[in-house]
């Protein structure tokens, strides 16, 4: 079985997409608390619609704040070092 590697350049995002600060805050807070997770579990834990979560994850990937990694046959979303800084900043603002 040949597995295609996902490339951030291939991921599409609407040009007029503006991320919700509330959604970003929920995603970041959940990732700080739970570490790397697959998108389905992350959407459940952050209490966000899956499609909405995916749009925000693509935006975060394009900004270099998260990256997708294959772990245990699952694609998990992981915070980068810049993402950890952003997460602590946005979590402090939302509280």
PLM regions and their residue ranges:
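Short amphipathic alpha-helical interaction segments
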Residues: 47-62
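Short amphipathic alpha-helical elements of helix-turn-helix/winged-helix folds
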Residues: 26-34
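Short alpha-helical segments that sit at the start of domains
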Residues: 2-27
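Short acidic, hydrophobic short linear motifs in intrinsically disordered regions
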Residues: 36-45
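Basic, amphipathic "hinge/linker" alpha-helix immediately C-terminal to the N-terminal HTH DNA-binding motif
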Residues: 73-88
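A compositional/biophysical signature of low hydrophobicity enriched in polar/charged and small residues
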Residues: 5-9, 85-86, 94
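A short, conserved structural fragment
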Residues: 61-71
């Amino acid at each position: 079985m040949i597995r295609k590697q996902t490339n951030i350049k291939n991921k599409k995002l609407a040009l007029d997409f503006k991320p919700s600060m509330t959604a970003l805050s929920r995603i970041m807070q959940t990732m700080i608390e739970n570490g790397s997770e697959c998108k389905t579990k992350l959407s459940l834990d952050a209490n966000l619609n899956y499609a909405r979560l995916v749009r925000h994850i693509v935006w975060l990937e394009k900004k270099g704040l998260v990256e997708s990694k294959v772990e245990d046959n699952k694609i998990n979303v992981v915070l980068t070092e810049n993402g950890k800084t952003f997460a602590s900043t946005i979590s402090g603002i939302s509280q």
